[in-house]
Amino acid sequence: MQELPAEWYGFQYRLDKTVHDDVYDIYSYINEAIHHSVTVYYHEETKEYKLRIRIGQIEFCRIECIAAKLDVFETLLRAQFDDILHDLVEFNPKTVSHIILAKHITEWKYQSLLPETLEGFTLFIRPSEPVRITNGSYIVFDYEDFSCDSNFIIYYNMFRDEFFGEARINNIPDMNYVFDSQKLSELQEKLTLHLIPRLQEIHQRAKEARK
C-alpha cells in the first residue's frame, strides 16, 4: 500500500481498515464527482481477497480479480487495476461483448428519446455506453436521483437473452416484471407506456419512506 498514489485518474486514495459483517475493507479509490469507487477487501466467508466496484448506486464484485492468496491477488491488481480505474472514467468499447453489439443495444434509436433529466432523475448511464457488471448482465441505461438514494435501471442478461428493469428506493432494491422483454422493440413499447409512471412511483415511495 506504500506504493499506491494519492490520486489515480481522478480517484482519491482512502485507507479503510473497516469491518462490515464478514467483510474487511482494506483501501478504496473514490471519485465522488462521478459517483464511482473501487474497494479492495477481504471476504471472511470465502477466505478470498476481492475487488468491489461501485457505479452510481450499484455495487458488484469483479470476478476477474478474486484470489485466496495475497501474492496472487496483488499480481491480479497490478495487471488490472489501472485499466479498471481508467475504464470507469472513460468508456472503453472493448468492454462491450459481441452479444451486446449483435443485439444493437449501442445503436438503439430509442436512446435519443431518453432525456437527460426525467421526473427528477438524471440519465447516468446510456445505451450507447453500456456497463458490464456480473452474472452476464449489462446496464443498458440508468436513471439516478442521488438526493433520495433511488434509481431505475434497465439491464440486459446475456445468459437469459432478456431485458429487465430494477429500481432502488432509498437504496433498497425493488423489482417488478413490467419491463421484461426479449427484444428491443418489445422493451421500447413497454418503456413508452411505463417508464414515466415507474419513475413517478419510485419518487413518491422514496418521499413517503422519508417522512
Which residue stretches match the model-derived regions?
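Mixed-charge, Lys/Arg-enriched low-complexity segments
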Residues: 59-105, 169-211
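Negatively charged, low-complexity tracts enriched in Asp/Glu with abundant Ser/Thr
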Residues: 1-29, 83-149
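Low-complexity, repetitive regions of proteins mediating host interaction that are extracellular
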Residues: 3-4, 34, 58-62, 68, ...
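Intrinsically disordered, low-complexity regulatory segments enriched in Ser/Thr/Pro
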Residues: 35-76, 144-186
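Structural alpha-beta junctions
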Residues: 10, 161, 196-197
